Every structure is written in structure tokens, then in C-alpha cells.
Curated annotation (Swiss-Prot):
It comes from Aliivibrio salmonicida (strain LFI1238). The keyword Disulfide bond does not apply. This is Putative transport protein VSAL_I2029. The chain crosses the membrane at residues 14-34, 37-57, 66-86, 94-114, 161-181, 386-406, 409-429, 451-471, 478-498, 539-559. Keywords: Cell membrane, Membrane, Repeat, Transmembrane, Transmembrane helix, Transport. GO terms for molecular function: monoatomic cation transmembrane transporter activity. Belongs to the AAE transporter (TC 2.A.81) family. YbjL subfamily.
Length: 560
């Protein structure tokens, strides 16, 4: 049996799609020193190569890819989107606007100076900012008819221009951002690692590289005369053992009877007490607890230690500092803080926002009690609420179909903005109603990434057919324009953050990378700073930047 692979691929879009995905993801895993292409650029390069060989892809497949991607972006942004205007949020919003407005202005100027074809400037800007949402917004404005092409301009040519501009510029945008993130602080004789350590010391944040997360352990001790002398007749509230050591007295056996003590309890000689705390907290106990008086009693030690992920929901908690929760007062222990999928340093001064996830451990009933005060315990389920997912997806498309007329001008949202709005709404409702619209984070990540990569396949295949011709005509112009659009907005944002907003450099660099929605650069900067402190800034700008980048793509193609 003879199989003509070339013919098979040209006749079967689904097979072609997954062949390009597989080859691209394989290339993405190749490392050159510490540099790795990443899945998006790996798939894009493969698709460009296959496109240059004459393979094509249906437009409908491309559309479903970008629709899924942008809808999932909205769901992820939903819980934190409205909190961006709280506290430091205005600073983060300003940085995003500086990057975006300067990038749009420079894109128009370079497009005019280099006489770039219609759509090429927009694609170049999307790549230079490593912002796929810009490309999504622009392509959707064309597909939906929101953007009316000038007379004599070919639709397919413009779509190819968008793809080629993005493909040429992406690598320039990524590498220049990583280099600037390292270089700009050094020009001021500042070190990212020192800046991160400064924030850590000022705010009492442990080093992410050194901090290890343990479950609390239970140990029991018999109260002797030495311990009675140490307590000096004070009750548990006055002793404040949990404030001094981090341990919490969960249970007491007195005269054979087990009891859960309150703050008024006074220890007596012969009591047996069970304490819950981290291993190092037990080590900080006064020696009068430990000197030969440890007790091994199954009933006394039979406490159910639970670890749960609590989602911040309640209005009286959102906007408070982490330290105001006083988790230790409830006998609970904080292990992790996650915001917008970014693990944050455990900073007691951090302001909580709806949708934040706190990983808390402690005795099961106490963890559930504190969860009711904060919000709700995240559902540990592998089942997605596909009804809500599909319903809001439909609503997003319907929002995009709504148009308004002003005289002879007709304006509408388009699918991209419509799906963003519906996605944000679903994400916001999910953060406030634990049983509604639940999608496991792993499923959401896979859907978003698959949608993005399918979109990349479509871009590469459509642009690849003329890639050599494009490069010979406009390649150097696009690369020069991309370098300008990538570098100058970052420098402007850095100057605003450093001299007007007076931001710590580690936070500032993280915020700029978030404003550029560039995850790969964030990983490199965290490694360079030897800290996750920059992630605080990244989480502050990332959600709002994703939304505004999509709108910017629509604006660019409308005004081009």
C-alpha cells in the first residue's frame, strides 16, 4: 500500500492541523542554552514552513481557534478585572495605557514612514508587543465586516499582511523585552535581585526559592510544674502561644475528658494538650513544653488536618490586607496565594481581590469556618459546567453581532470584544458563585492554549505561501518598525514607573511584562531576579492588558 503523505495532508485539514501542531510543539521544546522558543512561536514557524510548501487551512477552523482563545482569556480575567482600579491598580492601568498608546502611535508613524501595506502595521504591532489579542481583534474586525476596506484593497491580501507582520515581529518583540528587562535597571545602577530583596525585607516576604510549604503537624505534651510556672496563671488568650510560635492549641485532655479550649482556658498541671503548627513552629516552643513531656495518645492526636483552596468572594474581605485575615487566630495556616494563575509571594501587605485563591491548611472544621468568612472552597471536581460555558459563548457571539448606526457609519463590537465581555462576565460570576460556570483550571488552560495554537496554525499557513516574497519586499522594513515599536514603549513605561510612580524596579519590570502580556519573559525575569516578587507587578497589569490589547487591534485596523 502506497501512501502519498503530501496529497493526504492537502486533502485532510484535520490531519494537517495536528501534524503542524505536533511538529511545532516538538520544535518548541528544543533548547539553545537557556533559550527556548515556546509553543506559540514553534507552531508559527512550522506553519509558515508548511504554508510555503503550498498547504492551506480553512477559515472556519481559524475562527474557532481565536474564538476559544479570546473567550478563555475573558474567563481568566473576570475575577480580577474590576479590582484593577483598587489601590495600586491605577498605577498598573497607567502603565498599560502608556505601553498601548505609544505602541499605537509608533505603529502608525512607522507604517507611514516605511510605506507599509494595509494591515502590515497592525500585524507588526501585535508581534512587536508579543500580544496575540491585538491580532485577534484586528482579524475579527475584518471578518465581521466592522472594518471596511478601502476601495481596491484585497481582503485576502490584508489578512496575509496581518499574519506576516505578526510572524516577522514576534521574535523581535520577545528577545528585545527580555534584554530590556535586564538592561534598564542596570543603566540606573540597580540590580533586580537587590530590588526584589528590598521589597521582601520591607514587606516581610519570604524568598520563594527558600520557602518550603509544609502541612502543619500535630504533637501533644503533658503539662508539668515547669510549664505551669511559665504560664504564671495566664489564660490561653493572654499567653498568645500562636503569636509567639505559630502553634495553636487545638485540644486538651483534662481528667480523661477531651475538650476544645477557648481563649479563657487556663492550663493545669496534668493536662495533656495537642498543638498544631509547622515543624519549625514546634521548634520555637518554650523548652518547658518539650523536656521529656511529649505524649503519644491516639485520641488526643486524632485531628483531621485539611488543606483547601479558598476563593476570595465576600465583599468585606476583598480590599483587605492579607494580614487582616488573622488566620493564626483561627488555628489556620496559609501556604500559597494565587492570583490570575500566578503564584504570589506571601506578602502580609498584599490587598486581596475577588477571585484570589488562598491555599489554607489546619484542622478541618476550622478551615471550613474560615472559608465561610473569606468566600468558598474551590470545587475539586474534574467536571466542567459546559452548559454555562456554551451559553455564554453563544451570548458573546450575539453581543458581537449587535451594530449601531450613526448616520452613514455603522459600528459594532465584533466577535472578539463580544466574547471578551461574555467571558469576563462568566469569570466574574464564577468567582462569586462557586457552583456556577465551573471549569477546572487545567481544562481552561488546555482550551485556551489549543485555541491559540490553532489560530497560529491558520496564521502561518495563510502567510507562508508568500513568505519569501514578503521578506524580499518589506521584511527589513517590518523588522526595523518592530524593533522601534517593541523598545520605545517599554522605555517610556519604565521612565513613568521609575520617576513618576516611584515604583520598586522589580515590581515595575513585572508590571511592564504584564502590560506586554508576555509570559515567557516573566519566567526569565523571575529566574534573573531569583524571586517571584516581579510576579506581583505582572499580575497587576496582565488582566487589563489582555482586554485593552484586543480593543487596540480593532482600533488599529479601523484607523489604518
Amino acid at each position: 500500500m502506497n501512501i502519498d503523505v503530501a496529497t493526504l495532508l492537502s486533502q485532510n485539514d484535520i490531519l494537517l492541523l495536528f501534524v503542524v501542531l505536533a511538529l511545532g510543539l516538538f520544535i518548541a521544546k528544543v533548547k539553545i542554552g537557556s533559550f527556548q522558543l515556546g509553543s506559540s512561536i514553534g507552531v508559527l514557524i512550522t506553519a509558515l514552513f508548511m504554508g510555503s510548501l503550498g498547504y492551506t487551512f480553512t477559515a472556519d477552523s481559524l475562527n474557532i481557534g481565536f474564538m476559544l482563545f479570546i473567550f478563555c482569556v475573558g474567563i481568566e480575567a473576570g475575577p480580577n478585572f474590576f479590582g484593577i482600579f483598587l489601590r495600586d491598580g491605577k498605577h498598573y492601568l497607567l502603565l498599560v495605557l502608556v505601553v498601548l498608546i505609544s505602541a499605537i502611535s509608533l505603529s502608525f508613524l512607522t507604517g507611514y514612514y516605511f510605506n507599509l501595506d494595509y494591515g502590515l502595521s497592525t500585524g507588526m504591532m501585535a508581534g512587536a508587543l508579543t500580544a496575540t489579542p491585538v491580532l485577534v481583534g484586528a482579524k475579527d474586525a475584518l471578518n465581521s465586516g466592522l472594518a471596511v476596506l478601502p476601495e481596491g484593497v484585497d481582503f485576502s491580501k490584508v489578512m496575509d499582511n496581518l499574519s506576516v507582520g505578526y510572524a516577522f515581529s514576534y521574535l523581535i518583540g520577545l528577545t528585545s523585552l527580555i534584554l530590556l528587562a535586564r538592561l534598564l535597571p542596570q543603566l540606573q545602577k540597580q540590580n533586580l535581585q537587590d530590588s526584589a530583596m528590598q521589597i521582601a525585607q520591607e514587606r516581610g516576604i519570604g524568598s520563594a526559592g527558600q520557602r518550603k510549604v509544609y502541612l502543619p503537624i500535630i504533637r501533644a505534651y503533658r503539662v508539668g510544674q515547669e510549664l505551669i510556672d511559665w504560664t504564671d496563671g495566664k489564660n490561653l488568650r493572654e499567653l498568645g502561644i500562636h503569636r509567639q510560635t505559630g502553634c495553636h492549641i487545638e485540644r486538651i485532655r483534662r481528667n480523661g475528658i477531651l475538650a476544645n479550649p477557648d481563649g479563657d482556658y487556663i492550663l493545669q498541671q496534668g493536662d495533656e494538650i495537642a498543638l498544631v503548627g509547622y515543624p519549625d513552629s514546634h521548634a520555637r516552643l518554650d523548652s518547658s513544653f518539650r523536656n521529656g513531656k511529649e505524649v503519644f495518645d491516639r485520641n488526643l492526636l486524632d485531628l483531621r488536618i485539611a488543606e483547601e483552596e479558598i476563593v476570595v468572594k465576600n465583599d468585606n474581605i476583598a480590599g483587605k490586607r492579607l494580614s487582616e485575615l488573622n488566620l493564626s487566630e483561627y488555628g489556620c495556616f496559609l501556604n500559597r496565594v494565587v492570583r490570575a494563575q500566578i503564584e504570589m509571594p506571601i506578602e502580609h501587605d498584599i490587598v486581596l481581590a475577588k477571585g484570589d485563591i488562598l491555599q489554607v491548611s489546619g484542622e478541618k472544621s476550622k478551615v471550613h469556618h474560615i472559608a465561610d468568612k473569606i468566600g468558598f472552597i474551590s470545587i475539586h471536581s474534574q467536571v466542567s459546567d459546559l452548559l454555562a460555558f456554551c451559553s455564554f459563548f453563544i451570548l458573546g457571539i450575539m453581543f458581537g453581532m449587535i451594530t449601531m448606526s450613526f448616520g452613514q457609519v455603522t459600528f459594532g463590537l465584533g466577535n472578539a470584544v463580544g466574547l471578551l465581555i461574555s467571558g469576563i462576565t462568566l469569570g466574574f460570576l464564577r468567582a462569586n458563585h462557586p457552583t456556577f460556570g465551573y471549569v477546572p483550571q487545567g481544562a481552561l488552560n488546555m482550551t485556551k492554549n489549543l485555541g491559540l495554537l490553532v489560530f497560529m496554525v491558520g496564521i502561518g499557513l495563510s502567510a507562508g505561501g508568500n513568505i519569501i516574497e514578503y521578506f524580499s519586499e518589506d521584511g527589513l522594513k517590518v523588522l526595523a518598525a518592530a524593533l522601534i515599536v517593541s523598545v520605545i514603549p517599554v522605555i517610556l513605561a519604565y521612565l513613568v514607573g521609575a520617576y513618576i510612580l516611584k515604583m520598586n524596579r522589580a515590581l515595575l519590570i513585572g508590571a511592564i511584562i504584564g502590560a506586554r502580556t508576555c509570559g515567557p519573559a516573566m519566567d526569565v525575569v523571575n529566574e534573573h531576579a531569583r524571586s517571584t516578587i516581579p510576579a506581583l507587578g505582572y499580575a497587576g497589569t496582565y488582566a487589563i492588558a489582555n482586554i485593552l490589547m484586543t480593543v487596540a487591534g480593532t482600533i488599529m485596523i479601523l484607523l489604518a
